[in-house]
Amino acid sequence: MKVQYDQAAGVLYITLAEGAQVSRTVQVDAGTLVDLDRFGSVRGIEVIRPGRTWPLDEILSRFSVADADAHLLRELQSGPDSGRYAFAGPLHVVA
């Protein structure tokens, strides 16, 4: 998993599988896009204005996400620094 935050744009991008080909993108809400592969597995999530509550529960219930990735996504969303995202470059999270 790789997490990147673009401060200028206010966009968080979470890559679950690097190099995986994205077949389609689904808009979950006004500020959340989910990239899927041809099997319907989540390959990436883009969150505009990530300081808001974004629909992680809906993403996890609607799409295929590995258990380890789901756990890390929950930690990212609810951790002590959630909503702040002070990092400007890639943050590599090892599962």
Feature roles, as predicted:
Residues 1-95:
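Small, basic N-terminal interaction modules of short regulatory proteins
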